[in-house]
Swiss-Prot record:
Membrane topology according to the record: Peripheral membrane protein
Chief place where the protein resides: membrane
Residues annotated for GTP binding in this entry: 38-45, 124, 204-212, 291
Name of the gene encoding the protein in the UniProt record: SPR28
Family matches, as Gene3D superfamilies: P-loop containing nucleotide triphosphate hydrolases
Ranges in coiled-coil conformation: 384-417
Protein name: Sporulation-regulated protein 28
Amino acid sequence: MFPMKDHSALEQHTLSRDELRRRKGYKKGLQLSILLLGEKGSGKSTFLNNLCGQDISLSDGDYDDDDDKVTNNVTPENGNAIEDIDPGYKTAHLSPGLKLVTRRVYLNDELGVPITLDIILFPGCGDNVDNSQSSVVIKNYLDQQFANVLKEEVRIKRNTKETDGRPHVCLYFLKSTPRGVKKFDIELMKTICDKVNLIPIIPKADGLTETELNLHKDIVRQEISQNNIRVFDFKSDTLGETLALYDMDIDSSSAKSKYDNDTKIKEISPFAIVCSKTFNKNSENRVEHIRTYEWGSLVVEDQNTSDFIYLKAILLGSHLQELKDVTNNVLYENYRAKVLTEKKNNYDIPNYSYIDETSRGSVSNVSTRRNSASRTLGNPDTNDENAYQIHKEIDEKNRIIEDYQRKIDLLEKMLAAPHQNKV
């Protein structure tokens, strides 16, 4: 008798590196950082509650996208916080300013894999009379997250526990208007599209007829193409592949069905979604969010009435790792190459000014500035001992980087050279 083969060991040996990494990631849990942009009233907070299946408490004195109440915001007129002002005509003349709100949410998806969602919002984005500085602040925030990672990489003693604050995807909520996409939204998307994976969203799609919705999607696609806005590339991925992870299929035989399993994801973008604060559990004990009208009701998770379920499957399932890989291997590497190239004529990695959660100053007063150490290093002849030590440490780091670069260049030459030793 021949000994029985250990098929589990054989399977482990033949698994691809990506598959092994995926299985290991499932055991440790997954993490995704989501940036949500769009003007007030576009339904961002309700979308997050539907996506996470829970109330993530964005309205506890900081932010409520679906509420008219203004709390703890900053006005350009006086730079002071406004506390609990009643909605209506009393606040109609006030600009809300711009601030940063972050939340961390822990959830288990349908596959039973623990997922950590880091949520980033900029309340006031697009809501001010003068929005000219909003794009600068948001761009600087994204650049600063890249800079933080780069600073950690060039440290001699690296802090492996340093939090990575880079957003992996930006969901941009574009409210439908008769004139198409607003100029501010176009300019902001152009500004940030090379710093974060951009996915355009059409919220509150139930307010449009099917003809109006298709027209608005065409307008958004046209504006994105004409303005060379880079959006996340789904390549030839299909909706059927996306839903397969959720053990779901597209019922193309249904009269209501708009798509089939072979429909490419990029063909339905921008995603038209409907969300609701009302929910219940269906016969399979799954949470369903219900939107009620005079003529009936609509299930948010129904694939025939909204693109929400496809977007959820993309973010929490099929494309979660790809969004992170593109962020790290493409967007960050482009930033890193640019900064290190410029660094030959500079002493330090730049700092970028943006409004953090503790800053309540007016956006119009924000300007890019370097920190005190950078200003000191700008004068090589300074007698300041601290500046000398910092200067010396940076020179040491530069030498290490140059040594690594020489080794890389040497390896590339060796790989490119013909194998002359072969007979």
